[in-house]
């Protein structure tokens, strides 16, 4: 009997010890598992926090600039001054490219991989000297072609007079004023334009009017920037109203984009703002206008900013006579 009691007591004690071990070890195992899981999550988070960087390499002005940036971020591409003999157009991944850049100055580049950029330089010596005499006469559907603009338009007129003689102006008129923009157009330019149109009122053929204003209203004054969006809105509002008057006078209307400049040569104009102005204005002009995208044409094929009318200097804004003739030729072909 005593033996039996001892046996029962021993079994009970054994069972109790097993239970104690189970309840002691289980929480430790659970904590260990939890700790392992937490550690794994921390390691994963640590890996996720590791910033992946890419290198943007730019060769400019005889030096190589390397910039490390976060993958997926954006960088604003710089501009470069025009050296003697060429116009800087933008950037490309191809060395030695002379026109049609992949990227333009002040363009936002989305970086997802390492990239090496080279300047795209248009050599002035490669610009063709085209003949444009008689080009306007080939556009038979218009009785007259009127260009409206600023100093660039005035220099276009001077180029045609020098290169082709006064006869080329028989079918063309120019309403322009150096250094002016929308305010001048409202106060003086509109009246001058209608005076020119009045000379053709008796003709059955239409008059083509090509506007090329805007670059002077994008000037940074006193170090202050400019809102190209609001400037474009002001232009669109006025031009759309003017178009309704002009279409009743048998006119067909065109707006030629503000053409490129080089901010490094002319800090008061910014290339990205010219592009922004062109895009906004094109969207907001009404159906009475047809858009002439000479900006893209010049970027694709190149242009020269060594201007004969400025003492053969390069101010980054005004063009050579060869470029002006090419702009004129492009515009005439677009209105045919």
Each model region followed by its residue ranges:
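N-terminal secretory targeting modules
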Residues: 11-14, 30-35, 123-148, 153, ...
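Sec-dependent signal peptide cleavage junction
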Residues: 25-47
């Amino acid at each position: 009997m005593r033996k039996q009691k001892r046996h029962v007591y021993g079994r009970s004690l054994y069972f109790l010890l097993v239970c104690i071990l189970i309840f002691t070890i289980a929480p430790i195992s659970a904590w260990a598992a939890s700790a392992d899981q937490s550690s794994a999550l921390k390691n994963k988070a640590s890996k996720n926090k590791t910033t992946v960087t890419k290198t943007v390499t730019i060769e400019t002005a005889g030096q190589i600039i390397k910039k490390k940036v976060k993958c997926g971020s954006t960088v604003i591409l710089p501009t470069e001054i025009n050296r003697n003999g060429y116009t800087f157009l933008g950037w490309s991944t191809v060395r030695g490219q002379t026109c049609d850049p992949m990227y333009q100055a002040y363009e936002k580049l989305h970086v997802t991989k390492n990239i090496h950029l080279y300047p795209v330089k248009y050599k002035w010596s490669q610009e063709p000297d085209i003949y444009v005499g008689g080009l306007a006469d080939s556009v038979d559907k218009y009785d007259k072609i009127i260009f409206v603009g600023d100093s660039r338009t005035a220099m276009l007129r001077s180029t045609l007079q020098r290169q082709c003689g006064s006869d080329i102006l028989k079918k063309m008129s120019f309403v322009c004023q150096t250094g002016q923009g929308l305010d001048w157009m409202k106060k003086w330019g509109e009246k001058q334009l209608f005076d020119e149109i009045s000379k053709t009122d008796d003709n059955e053929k239409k008059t083509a009017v090509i506007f090329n204003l805007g670059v002077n209203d994008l000037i940074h004054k006193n170090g202050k920037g400019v809102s190209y969006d609001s400037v474009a809105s002001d232009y669109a509002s006025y031009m759309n109203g003017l178009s309704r008057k002009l279409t009743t006078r048998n006119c067909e209307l065109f707006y030629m984009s503000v053409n490129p400049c080089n901010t490094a040569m002319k800090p008061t104009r910014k290339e990205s703002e010219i592009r922004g102005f062109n895009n906004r204005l094109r969207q907001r002009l009404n159906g009475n206008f047809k858009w002439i995208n000479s900006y893209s044409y010049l970027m694709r094929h190149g242009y020269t900013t060594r201007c004969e009318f400025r003492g053969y200097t390069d101010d980054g804004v005004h063009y050579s006579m060869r470029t002006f003739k090419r702009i004129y030729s492009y515009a005439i072909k677009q209105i045919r």
